[in-house]
Amino acid sequence: MRIAIVGGGLAGSLAAAVLTRAGYRVALIDKRAVYPEEFRVEKLGGQQVDILRRLGLLDAFANEGCTFDTTLNIRRGKVVDISRTVNYGLHYAPMVAIARRLIADPSSLIVDQVLKITPSDDLQRLTLASGNQVVARLVILATGMAGAIPYSLGIKRRVIVERHSLALGFTIAPADGAEFAFSALTSYGEQAADGIDYLSIFPIRGGMRANLFMFRDPNDPIMREIRREPKSTLLRLIPGLRQHLGDFKVIDRVQSWVMDLANVEGHLQPGVVLIGDSFQTSCPAAGTGVSRLLVDVERLCTVHLPEWLTTGGMGTEKIAAFYSDRDKIASDEFAFRMAHFRQALTADAGVRWDLRRRLHFLRRNLRHRVDAIRPGWTGRLAGMLRA
């Protein structure tokens, strides 16, 4: 009996890849045979790389992404520190395409639209726009922020912070056709009133990609200015960039993405489980969205689902085990904490957060200076203190 996955974005496609490679029969249902270009996550790193490696999927992303392992971090034009971790830059649609190619059985993809799900303690019935039906033991909802199907099941989205953050993306290049003096760069906002968390510049197919993360009202006139005159507006908001970028040009249109912080209620139902943004959204600036998605995929597809399928039925007692998984809960809670922390550290002009902001960057810079003299010393000291 099949497992049905509704939604063929990154979460659904990765779940299908993990399950089919483990020998399970899967129906991945999405109305698009080829996922369209969308501005979403454009970089993989840190915990995401670790989980993809454990799942046996990393090489496919590493082979197609632009690899970089050194990021220069600056604020007000001065070096804060240097990050040395492996990252891969690639657009969201190619990420989804890679995940779909990793599906062991290509016939698992059904290009259709789910109109209705009839759940039960035993079998789940999905009615498709084509008139066909799919019967499955379990339905994995990976529909992202599209709420029609969850809503039809009585699952409601609860907005915790409306329009919490903004992400903008565009591609830049040196005006003289040469190369930038860095492999990747992060420039943090220079004053709280601007609401700029950071600008991340990294390599991607087609040039150097710039992702700007802000805590501003989407209707603020500055948004229109960034879209119309991205270069001049960026240099006005982050003047310290000029000495590191030199003369540059923006070579494509500015894309944007507004994110609400939200989760769901009414989700504990027989035969249906939600993963990724379908269950909870994350702040793009915090960089926790794909990490959460991957934790969901790993815990569901390698731990809980194999256990569920050893016995009959798919009641709420099984589904509840996933939602109460300690790793999942920790990941979800960390994402919300980081969302609020990044906003306060970036845009709270109060005395407390102004002091905390100064100390945050001072500590990072001091560690960087000490490590330049005695490489690895601060890391060893931190390890001894934790022990």
Predicted regions and their residues:
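Conserved Rossmann-like nucleotide-cofactor binding loop
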Residues: 11, 34, 146
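Conserved N-terminal helical subregion
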Residues: 50, 54, 61-155, 159-165, ...
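Glycine-rich FAD pyrophosphate-binding loop
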Residues: 6, 20-40
